[in-house]
Design a protein with these regions (language model features):
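N-terminal secretory signal peptides that target proteins for export/translocation
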Residues: 1-26
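Bacterial N-terminal signal peptides
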Residues: 30-44
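Cleavable N-terminal signal peptides
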Residues: 39, 49-50, 220
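Signal peptide processing junction and immediate N-terminal pro/mature segment
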Residues: 43-55
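N-terminal extension/subdomain marker
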Residues: 54-169
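Terminal, contiguous helix-loop blocks that mediate binding/assembly
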Residues: 55-64, 166, 181-184, 188-438
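Residue-level detector of buried hydrophobic side-chain packing
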Residues: 94-95, 175, 220, 393
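Short acidic, glycine-rich surface-loop motifs adjacent to enzyme active sites
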Residues: 171-185
Length: 438
């Protein structure tokens, strides 16, 4: 449900009839998820990429167990050429250290934009690689030259997935997204400097709808493991791996991931997500402090329903427990390298249960804790992260009125969180934040 849809009087009326409000909530969430999963966005809806996709090969490879797709956006401004050098490093030193075999095919769309690098030749633009063992990412080794390509366009992602599926069909598909990232926040993830574009979360969901989803998504970006980002994938992926905090340039260890997958090509999407998350610990540098793997199935739906109940009860009891909420929010863990508005979901429930006297809210929190333990398949963090458990949620502070220039004021003035995210369509958390910010 979109936050802001109710006015304050509606919230007050809901206090009297809150039990009626619960009726059918689980059904509503399940129906919305099912409808979203059934929709397919027409290609005309998606903005076209700068360059058309190349012709598909007439003779596709035999069907593999897995096709691993890596969407590598290195088209950054000249001040971030270090990211571009890691693009070449990850292909040559990690992905090509294992390469493809009959069970696991690996394809990469790598965009260096207009900023040439001496590594592997000074090619620019975007190239598609079918990665074989020992390969280097030179122009001569590219399967296709896509030229100037907008990696921030959902159509580019659709074209890449379609190309990979047609040329390298498989029983399962994994998609790794490689770039900077800032969670659900718009105009920050998959930045394409040449096109001045970003792949925002609503566009990502559109693209995944258009290709009928994948089996597993790996976020080789910062701040991805939030319940809001997970909601964008629900219905179009079975599991995801990433970090609820910032990550270093090393990110995933693709060598470890591909070695494990080739050794056990029958592994499930959930198992692959765990392997991917574990690889962050194996190859982490001093900037990668946390990683987790999350299941996006029915248990995730139940967790989202529990968070919706919690958001509703927090909203209708706000006047009674505002101070207790503030204490709980302040005490809840916030990964040190992420936005200060993000809080660890599990720790939020722990602190609310400890500081808020409402029996209903305590029950809601207990339900959230129980379900998150089932949803998080594996998680790891260094001690400096504090008591984090694998999933963040957005909960900004609430100055009254919002202070000029505060991040909360920015959110209140910019309705993306309320209007464009699947999470706020499915739950009442956005309604709570709207009331909380007043």
């Amino acid at each position: 449900m979109r936050a802001g849809a109710r006015k304050g009087s509606h919230i007050r009326r809901a206090i009297e009839g809150e039990d009626r409000r619960r009726t059918g909530l689980i059904a509503r969430v399940c129906v919305l998820v099912a409808v979203s999963a059934a929709l397919c966005v027409a290609a005309a809806v998606l903005p076209r990429a700068a360059a058309a996709a190349p012709a598909l090969a007439p003779n596709p490879a035999p069907t593999a167990a897995w096709t691993v797709m890596v969407y590598m956006d290195g088209d950054q401004n000249p001040g971030d050429l270090y990211l571009g050098s890691w693009l070449t490093h990850d292909i040559d030193k990690e992905i090509a250290a294992v390469g493809s075999d009959a069970d696991v095919q690996v394809v990469v769309l790598a965009d260096r934009g207009r900023y040439p690098s001496a590594a592997d030749g000074s090619w620019t633009g975007a190239r598609v690689f079918h990665v074989t063992k020992g390969m280097t990412a030179t122009a001569a080794n590219a399967a296709a030259d896509w030229g100037p390509t907008d990696m921030g366009s959902p159509q580019t992602l659709v074209d890449f997935v379609d190309w990979a599926r047609t040329n390298y069909p498989a029983r399962h598909y994994a998609l790794f997204l490689w770039d900077h990232g800032w969670g659900w926040w718009p105009d920050n993830t998959m930045e394409d400097d040449t096109s001045n574009d970003y792949l925002d979360m609503d566009e990502l969901r559109d693209a995944l709808e258009a290709v009928h989803g994948v089996d597993m998504v790996g976020w080789d970006t910062c701040l991805s493991q939030t319940i809001e980002v997970e909601a964008q994938l629900r219905g179009f992926a079975d599991a995801m791996a990433g970090s609820q905090d910032s990550i270093g340039y090393s990110g995933f260890s693709y060598q470890n991931i591909l070695s494990a997958l080739q050794g056990s090509p029958a592994m499930s999407p959930a198992a692959l997500a765990v392997v991917a998350a574990r690889s962050m610990k194996t190859g982490h540098d001093r900037w990668t402090w946390a990683a987790s793997a999350v299941s996006l199935g029915r248990r995730w739906d139940a967790l989202t329903t529990a968070v919706s109940y919690l958001g509703w009860d927090l909203a209708v009891r706000l006047r009674d427990y505002h101070r207790a909420y503030a204490v709980a929010r302040r005490r809840a863990a916030s990964p040190p390298q992420t936005y200060p508005e993000d809080r660890d979901l599990y720790d939020v429930a722990m602190e609310l249960r400890s500081h808020v006297a409402s029996p209903a809210i305590k029950r809601d929190c207990t339900r959230v804790l129980k379900l998150e333990r089932k949803v998080v398949l594996w998680q790891w963090h260094v001690k400096a992260e504090g008591p984090v458990h694998g999933i963040d949620i957005f909960w900004p502070s609430s100055p009254a009125p919002p202070q000029k220039g505060s991040s909360f004021e920015q959110w209140m003035d910019f309705p993306y969180y309320c209007a464009d995210l699947n999470f706020t369509r499915l739950t009442d958390w956005g309604d709570f934040l709207t009331a909380w910010g007043k």
